[in-house]
Amino acid sequence: MIDRYKHQQLRIGLVSPQQISAWATKIIPNGEIVGEVTKPYTFHYKTNKPEKDGLFCERIFGPIKSGICACGNYRVIGDEKDDPKFCEQCGVEFVDSRIRRYQMGYIKLTCPVTHVWYLKRLPSYIANLLDKPLKELEGLVYCDFSFARPITKKPTFLRLRGSFEYEIQSWKYSIPLFFTTQGFDIFRNREISTGAGAIREQLADLDLRIIIENSLVEWKQLGEEGPTGNEWEDRKIVRRKDFLVRRMELAKHFIRTNIEPEWMVLCLLPVLPPELRPIIQIEGGKLMSSDINELYRRVIYRNNTLTDLLTTSRSTPGELVMCQEKLVQEAVDTLLDNGIRGQPMRDGHNKVYKSFSDVIEGKEGRFRETLLGKRVDYSGRSVIVVGPSLSLHRCGLPREIAIELFQTFVIRGLIRQHLASNIGVAKSQIREKKPIVWEILQEVMQGHPVLLNRAPTLHRLGIQSFQPILVEGRTICLHPLVCKGFNADFDGDQMAVHVPLSLEAQAEARLLMFSHMNLLSPAIGDPISVPTQDMLIGLYVLTSGTRRGICANRYNPCNQKNYQNERIYETNYKYTKEPFFCNSYDAIGAYRQKRINLDSPLWLRWQLDQRVIASREVPIEVHYESFGNYHEIYAHYLIVRSVKKETFCIYIRTTVGHISFYREIEEAIQGFSQACSYDT
């Protein structure tokens, strides 16, 4: 069992055969060691009881019913009497039946078997460590060919071949003869090596530190050579350098985690606890079994057949032995990852068997569906919509979701304020949706953050905390600036909301997970809260204005009154006299009174100390008044000057959208400057 206080993380990796044996074996009170599964049977067809030493054996995995052995005897669990704690007839311990959820078994393989994840998955770890092509290793694993291994200094059959100056044409047919004769085991153990055993020997002979040193030397040599001028050769060099880097990283990982490379070849195959691969009886007396049970049975059948060939019959042809070893390897491959070598194995109904990899990987796998994606209390889910009026650290929760999430807190508040005598009365008030309920709910939400999560959670910004506020409707309102961290948009995306309960969780949510504290990407440090999608379109509409220039609009800056008068030219062009405003407040007030539009051009009086004049720009028109004053009209501004060429005032041509955007930027800069001054 995993203690959640002692174990804070879960890691999947390689383990030694000794560790597998320690997990799966146990010593029963009579001193007998059990744990090895030797029979491919599950339940007896007459008694419906688990077969001894089978895949559901009660001696190995524990009793089906707590305190009841296979014989039917009953003992009280935890009784301190001198009664034996196991049945002497069947050897089953009197323990809790929950042990069948975590007690493992093992299959002792007659021949070594490579772990298909480390051989066939890309990149192939075995091929990287051995620095050999994957196809060559596959041919060796599946007994398609062998390689010589003269392990002694004495003359051997294969060494004699090199002592001749010429080679007889029929020499290549002489070695296969040994595969069909008696004494093949002696020849094989002395002369050749094939199958997963050959891979295991090569991995066991590796020195990881020497691999790192040699790979680093070769990488430096390739880097010093420089480009050859041949594009094909340069690509080969780049690929080789990338391979050397991966090989060094893999070797360093093995050293850092104290993993031996030969552990990628299995000698003991773990058997999952029975409760994780159940057989269930449904209506009509039919049985439904997990596919993993059938795959385990296939492995045991083939492994027992190989054992019989090597032990009971001494005259078994070597080709038959190698063929059976290949079948064992393929059976284990199918158990671990069905279909990784091509066509998947199917049952009698042409249905693909669900292997161990299929059980744990993907959206419906054990981790994502049962562990990471399981339903939890104090959580809800809804569609997200944009909340432009929200602060960056706030989110809008629908009343229907909020009252369910904070119901226990509201009940406590009602009882503390003596508005309800007990929990039942408080729940009835919540169902009736009395006004006092919403008041207490708002008080509770003010001091309690919530966590928003959007699947898939690929980095830590996939879960952020917000200060909730009540909103109408049934959707969660979210500030558009936080969407990039969630990789969310408002086209129907859903997000989950969670309530942190413990003080530690609330402190972490406030100090580390608030959205306004996660403005930079944790990976590269770039700003993560930047305008995207809807905000960019809104800013474009806000600041676009009309495309008509000053030449298309014959302005008369002297006529600053009655700017709503309109006249239509012969070209059906609607011309509006553009108004003048002394400050931005008057312009925004006119927009709110619907006297002008958001993109209507206007003239805004500007401060004289802010330069808007380009050095080489010349006026488009100059209008003179009777008193000698004149107006220089440019493309986007005009200047009022006196007879002495003194500047009276400056007007810039802009829109209400530009003014609003400028004021927001100005307030943000002023607030940032004040914050910096307080810090200093």
From Swiss-Prot:
GO molecular-function term, one example from the UniProt record: DNA-directed RNA polymerase activity
Signal peptide as annotated in the record: none
Cofactor, how bound (note): Binds 1 Mg(2+) ion per subunit. Binds 1 Zn(2+) ion per subunit.
Cofactor: Mg(2+); Zn(2+)
A single GO cellular-component term on record: chloroplast
Domain of life from the UniProt record: Eukaryota
Documented EC number(s): 2.7.7.6
InterPro entries: DNA-dir_RpoC_beta_prime (IPR045867), RNA_pol_asu (IPR000722), RNA_pol_N (IPR006592), RNA_pol_Rpb1_1 (IPR007080), RNA_pol_Rpb1_3_sf (IPR042102), RNA_pol_Rpb1_clamp_domain (IPR044893), RNApol_RpoC1 (IPR034678)
Principal location class: plastid
A single GO BP: DNA-templated transcription
Positions that bind Zn(2+): C69, C71, C87, C90
Key words, A-Z: Chloroplast, DNA-directed RNA polymerase, Magnesium, Metal-binding, Nucleotidyltransferase, Plastid, Transcription, Transferase, Zinc
Binding site for Mg(2+): D489, D491, D493
Annotated localization: Plastid, Chloroplast
Transmembrane segments: none
Quaternary structure annotation from Swiss-Prot or TrEMBL: In plastids the minimal PEP RNA polymerase catalytic core is composed of four subunits: alpha, beta, beta', and beta''. When a (nuclear-encoded) sigma factor is associated with the core the holoenzyme is formed, which can initiate transcription.
PANTHER family reported in the protein's UniProt record: DNA-DIRECTED RNA POLYMERASE (PTHR19376), DNA-DIRECTED RNA POLYMERASE SUBUNIT BETA (PTHR19376:SF54)
Family, per entry: Belongs to the RNA polymerase beta' chain family. RpoC1 subfamily.
HAMAP family: RNApol_bact_RpoC1
Name used for this protein in its record: DNA-directed RNA polymerase subunit beta'
Provenance organism: Barbarea verna (Land cress)
Gene: rpoC1
